[in-house]
From Swiss-Prot:
The lineage of its organism: Bacteria, Bacillati, Actinomycetota, Actinomycetes, Mycobacteriales. GO terms for biological process: negative regulation of growth; response to host. It holds the Pfam family CcdA. The keyword Protein biosynthesis does not apply. It comes from the Bacteria. Induction: Induced during infection of mouse macrophages. Induced in persister cells in response to D-cycloserine. Antitoxin component of a type II toxin-antitoxin (TA) system. Upon expression in M.smegmatis neutralizes the effect of cognate toxin VapC3. This is Antitoxin VapB3. InterPro entries: Post-segregation_anti-tox_CcdA. The keyword Transferase does not apply.
Amino acid sequence: MLSRRTKTIVVCTLVCMARLNVYVPDELAERARARGLNVSALTQAAISAELENSATDAWLEGLEPRSTGARHDDVLGAIDAARDEFEA
């Protein structure tokens, strides 16, 4: 939309979001208010992180275990050698 008076463009974006009730202890809510935290953004980030972690866990559980025949100590030694090489 173009404003005739100021000749600037005004953009309006509609975002549909569900409204949820989140219950936290009174003391935690007070501390969040005192710090000026955006509880909505923090809640969104926490839910997103949990969903991503759950998806990763589900993917890992779906993998078939395969033995490479490599011993754990040999793998750790190879990783240490690679780190040393890249740090040099």
